[in-house]
């Protein structure tokens, strides 16, 4: 399945170019809370997109009056939907598919919070809240709104499986093309920070009060983030019409579940291992073929040990280069699989390996460590991207360089 285009917005940049620059220069996106109205300002670091909602409306190209299913006036569209539109539009522009209207085009978008930021604003105003804000609450709303803005008419659906949501959206999008249902799919996900997510993760006591350090022996937890990331997947027939040949394909995908706990990974990493193993089998590869792993790597004690244990079981004795880009973007929840898929495709396209920021102390339980420097011109053939969510929902994607 060819990847024709990518689009992204995150705490380290409003587009692909800005995000790549931050990755190359080791510029993380964590900071004090600026836009979310919460009692935790100046107490808990997060990785917010560096733009107000009004600025996001400008970037998304929405006017004073919002057309489409949202209706109403500017200022009422959820942050989740705005982030989604910005990244999805960049992905389509990047793909530059000639005569897109001639192809069966769909969108598979993921998120976990929907328009909850607007719902929270509604309830904060008591009886003065505007009911239109609540209409955007459910997860499918942002997908519908973005599809309308982009003129996508053939197919739209929403996936919400916690932190593996976007990876599952990409895998499902590929299936739609493989089975001849669609020719082009915009696949990925989006999520905005909300009080609900910040309060919930704080209640679980897995937030780091400093900037997170995934896969470090002294890690203390994760930093929440927000953003959106999308790929444009195309059939062979569409790929043949592109002026520039796609240099990357989605060669494998798998979803598994360890059925262990609602908010924790199994200590033996069984779900993670099964997802990675099956994705490799479906791509026709061996563990030794993987050149780089974009780790799920949240920075929590449980997640990193479970993922690391699964990697040791599957890859020993030869471990590929690996790192967690959540050390840049924070954990963007439903958007993380999409954002990290974009980074994985860029790694295949350009031969990049990203650093695992703030890593100092190896985990004593693991025989490997992540990369700590940005590496250029690496002969990358295959990249694995891991996304492991609450409820034991584990997904792995494999991206491969096209054979000449």
Segments predicted by a language model, with ranges:
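N-terminal amphipathic, basic-rich helices that act as targeting or association modules
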Residues: 1-3, 10, 74-90, 99-101
């Amino acid at each position: 399945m060819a990847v024709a285009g990518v689009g992204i917005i995150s705490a380290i940049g409003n587009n692909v170019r800005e995000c790549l620059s931050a990755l190359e220069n080791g510029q993380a996106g964590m900071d004090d809370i600026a836009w979310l109205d919460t009692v935790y300002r100046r107490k808990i670091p997060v990785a917010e997109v560096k733009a107000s909602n009004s600025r996001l409306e400008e970037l998304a190209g929405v006017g004073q009056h919002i057309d489409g299913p949202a209706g109403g006036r500017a200022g009422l569209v959820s942050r989740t939907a705005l982030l989604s539109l910005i990244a999805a539009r960049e992905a389509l522009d990047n793909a530059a598919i000639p005569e897109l209207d001639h192809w069966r085009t769909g969108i598979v978008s993921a998120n976990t919070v929907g328009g909850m930021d607007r719902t929270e604003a509604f309830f904060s105003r008591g009886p003065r809240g505007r009911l239109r804000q609540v209409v955007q609450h459910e997860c499918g709303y942002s997908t519908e709104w973005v599809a309308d803005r982009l003129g996508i008419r053939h197919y739209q659906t929403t996936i919400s499986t916690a932190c593996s949501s976007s990876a599952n959206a990409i895998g499902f999008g590929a299936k739609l093309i493989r089975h001849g249902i669609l020719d082009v799919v915009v696949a990925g996900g989006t999520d905005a920070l909300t009080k609900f997510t910040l309060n919930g993760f704080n209640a679980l006591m897995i937030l780091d009060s400093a900037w997170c350090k995934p896969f470090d022996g002294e890690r203390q937890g994760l930093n929440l983030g927000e953003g959106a990331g999308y790929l444009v997947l195309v059939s062979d027939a569409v790929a043949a019409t592109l002026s520039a040949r796609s240099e990357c394909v989605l060669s494998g995908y798998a979803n598994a579940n360890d059925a262990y706990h609602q908010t924790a990974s199994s200590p033996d990493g069984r779900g993670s291992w099964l997802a990675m193993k099956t994705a490799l089998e479906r791509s026709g590869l061996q563990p030794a073929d993987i050149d780089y792993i974009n780790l799920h790597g949240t920075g929590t004690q449980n997640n990193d040990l479970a993922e690391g244990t699964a990697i040791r079981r599957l890859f020993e004795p030869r471990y590929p280069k690996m790192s967690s880009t959540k050390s840049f973007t924070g954990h963007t929840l439903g958007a993380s699989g999409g954002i990290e898929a974009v980074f994985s495709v860029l790694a295949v396209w350009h031969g990049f390996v990203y650093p695992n920021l703030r890593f100092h102390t190896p985990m004593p339980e693991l025989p490997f460590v992540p990369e700590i420097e940005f590496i250029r011109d690496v002969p990358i053939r295959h990249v694995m991207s891991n996304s492991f969510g609450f409820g034991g929902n584990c997904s792995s994607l494999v991206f491969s360089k096209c054979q000449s």
